[in-house]
From Swiss-Prot:
Lineage, top ranks: Eukaryota, Metazoa, Chordata, Craniata, Vertebrata
Modified residues (Isoleucine amide): I27
Family: Belongs to the glucagon family.
The organism of origin for this protein: Cavia porcellus
Transmembrane segments: none
Protein name per UniProt: VIP peptides
Length: 72
């Protein structure tokens, strides 16, 4: 009887540990995916800001060049 109780309790404990590991892996995977998505969104946002700033700079340079050619 004692062996059966021990085996049953031990099996339950292993099941709980497996479930805990599985949940922790899901949580870590979800956190990593959220961090990757946030990093990708931040990278895309940074790229867009760079492109916007670069486009403005090019327009300003073109305007200066045009004004220089008209005024001189």
């Amino acid at each position: 009887h004692a062996d059966g109780v021990f085996t049953s309790d031990y099996s339950r404990l292993l099941g709980q540990l497996s479930a805990r590991k599985y949940l922790e892996s899901l949580i870590x995977x979800x956190x990593x995916x959220x961090x990757x998505x946030x990093x990708x969104x931040x990278x895309x946002h940074s790229d867009a800001l760079f492109t916007d700033t670069y486009t403005r700079l090019r327009k300003q340079m073109a305007m200066k060049k045009y004004l220089n050619s008209v005024l001189n």
